[in-house]
């Protein structure tokens, strides 16, 4: 079998920003955290699944905390110090993710809730009866 040549397979992005935008999409099943530049180009991302959780554990606050820590470490490595945070969704990972970003050393300029709310749009699914 042929040996693999060259370095690691993961590309290292050469970025020299000092400002970024963190998008936190928090659902009841998972939390996805994406770091972008101000134009919206993705620099790095993490979720409950990428930090090692499976199934229902992806939606826990602890999984969101670990994902946020991973993104924050990568942002600091790239030289990003200041971020805006855009939060979308009602999940349990919203608050722990923001707290972890702050605790990791990122300076948060603003926190904005961008959860889409319909102005009487489509008919919702039927109510869940337990």
From Swiss-Prot:
Disulfide bridge positions per record: none
Top-level taxonomic group: Bacteria
Keywords: Ribonucleoprotein, Ribosomal protein, RNA-binding, rRNA-binding
Any Gene Ontology biological process: translation
Statement: the UniProt record of this protein carries the keyword RNA-binding: yes
Subunit structure: Part of the 30S ribosomal subunit. Interacts with proteins S7 and S18. Binds to IF-3.
Function in brief: Located on the platform of the 30S subunit, it bridges several disparate RNA helices of the 16S rRNA. Forms part of the Shine-Dalgarno cleft in the 70S ribosome.
Protein name: Small ribosomal subunit protein uS11
Organism: Thermotoga maritima (strain ATCC 43589 / DSM 3109 / JCM 10099 / NBRC 100826 / MSB8)
Gene: rpsK
């Amino acid at each position: 079998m042929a040996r693999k040549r060259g370095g690691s397979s993961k590309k290292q992005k050469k970025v020299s920003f000092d400002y970024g935008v963190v998008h936190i999409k928090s659902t009841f099943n998972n939390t996805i955290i994406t770091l972008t530049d101000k134009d919206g180009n993705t620099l790095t991302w993490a979720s409950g699944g990428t930090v090692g959780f499976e199934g229902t554990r992806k939606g826990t606050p602890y999984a969101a905390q670990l994902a946020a820590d991973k993104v924050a470490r990568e942002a600091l490595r790239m030289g990003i110090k200041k971020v805006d945070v855009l939060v979308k969704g009602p999940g349990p990972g919203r608050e722990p993710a923001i707290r972890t970003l702050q605790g990791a050393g990122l300076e948060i300029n603003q926190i904005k809730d961008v959860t889409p709310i319909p102005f009487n749009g489509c008919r919702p699914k039927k109510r869940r009866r337990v």
